[in-house]
Design a protein with these regions (language model features):
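N-terminal cationic and glycine-rich segments that engage phosphates or anionic surfaces
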Residues: 1-99, 104-420
Length: 420
């Protein structure tokens, strides 16, 4: 592994990409420490003392939300816009045509996604700022102050979107994913320090700290296993004679990932369950406040609904992201078939059955990952440390994808890579 790392310094292109990515990370981390003007910092900090959903959102923002910096919303509006575009691509003919139109189509989708990011970002920023005004967190409670702060937050998200796109174009890995990755990794030392403080004041004992460490290591192993897990369906290609040459006749496989949906179902479910609490910030009606209290982060009702929504969205997103019928038709056109299964519709039905079974495993895994912070808090007594499976899932997934990209760049220059 050390020799492989040293090989990076020998590849000029790869070295430049790594340096560029690190420079963009520095810009990102500097922006986290630039506060939004006109906000009471002490009031903002009080929102993060109870270990609620705000803490999880702050984890993804790399600590920018608790500081209420210009990057407080992180890249969330861009992610939401991208997800919406993916969903629309399955139901809107124009977007579906763009997705099949190669590079030009991708440029059009990217352009619409950027516009969607600005719109969603301003809506989210306005809602967040308006809620802070209701909590007396603004120095100036005028409507113009709310608009100004909303514009600053939206501009911060747009800057992050630009940084992510620049990393993708000139750096290494997927820029948007790496921004989230950097934000989560940057908060890990804070989590370790919090556990140390708990030990110092006697909130937890050494046994609980060791138990937490064991659970953390076990989760890392489990997340890596599930992220890399796949069901390989064997595919055989028939031999074809063209002129005097024979083509085909080789074997391959169709990889079906256990966790095809990634963390998107968790994002969907979180967004829906955040709505009652958000509504309660604006509607000061007793029954609305009562209903919202049942959806507070960590309550039994919220936990059950969270798991159910994740199961639903895992199947939903997997269904729209993989067109099994087109897959079977393309396989048939190129002379491919699954041994023992007839080409065409029987192949599509078989793949659908297999996909349904392995998606169930992935769905339960995601649900377990999502409610893990509550379970860890109950077992170890450690609250407010967001060492959750969701964060691990993102960190492991991004790290593996980036390593594979580095691997391909190294191997093209005949260097020994990372992956054995």
């Amino acid at each position: 592994m050390l020799a492989s790392l040293l090989n990076i310094t020998k590849v000029t292109e790869l070295r430049n990409k790594v340096v560029y990515t690190l420079l963009m990370f520095i810009v990102f981390r500097l922006g986290i420490h630039i506060p939004v003007p006109g906000v009471e910092a002490s009031v903002i900090e009080s929102l993060f003392t109870s270990g609620n959903l705000f803490g999880l959102l702050d984890l993804f923002a790399g600590g920018a939300l608790s500081k209420f910096s210009i990057f407080a919303m992180s890249i969330t509006p861009y992610i939401n816009a991208s997800i919406i575009m993916q969903l629309l691509g399955a139901v809107v003919p124009t977007f579906e045509a763009w997705s099949k139109d190669g590079e030009e189509g991708r440029k059009k989708i990217a352009k619409v996604t950027r516009y969607g990011t600005v719109v969603l970002g301003f809506i989210q920023a306005f809602g967040m700022t308006y809620a802070l005004r209701a909590s007396n967190a603004l120095i100036d409670n005028s409507f113009m102050s709310v608009i100004l702060i909303s514009i600053i937050l939206t501009a911060g998200t747009c800057l992050l979107m630009w940084i992510g796109e620049q990393i993708t174009a000139h750096g290494i890995g997927n820029g948007i994913s790496l921004i989230i990755f950097a934000g989560i990794v940057a908060r890990f030392p804070d989590g370790v320090h919090t556990i140390y403080q708990y030990l110092q004041v006697g909130t937890i004992n050494v046994f609980q700290a060791i138990l937490f460490a064991i659970i953390a290591v076990a989760m890392i192993v489990l997340v890596i296993a599930v992220t890399q897990g796949q069901r390989r369906i064997p595919i055989q290609y028939a031999k074809r004679v063209v002129g005097r040459k024979m083509y085909g006749g080789h074997s391959t496989f169709l990889p079906l990932k256990v966790n095809q949906a990634g963390v998107i179902p968790i994002i969907f479910a979180s967004s829906i369950l955040m709505f009652p609490a958000t509504l309660a910030q604006f509607v000061q009606v007793p029954w609305v406040q009562t209903v919202a209290s049942y959806f507070q982060w960590g309550t039994p009702i919220q936990t059950i609904l969270y798991a159910v929504l994740i199961l639903f969205f895992t199947y939903f997103y997997t269904a729209i992201s993989i067109n099994i019928t087109d897959m079977a038709d393309n396989m048939k056109k190129h002379g491919g078939f699954i041994p023992g299964i007839r080409p065409g519709k029987p192949t599509a039905d078989y793949v659908d059955r297999v996909m349904t079974r392995i998606t169930l495993v992935g769905a339960f895994f995601l649900a377990f990952v999502a409610i893990l912070p509550n379970m860890i808090g109950g077992l170890t007594g450690i609250q407010g440390v967001y060492f959750g499976g969701t964060a691990l899932l993102i960190v492991v997934g991004v790290a593996l994808d980036t390593m594979q990209q580095v691997e391909s760049l190294v191997l093209t220059r005949q260097y020994k890579g990372f992956v054995k």
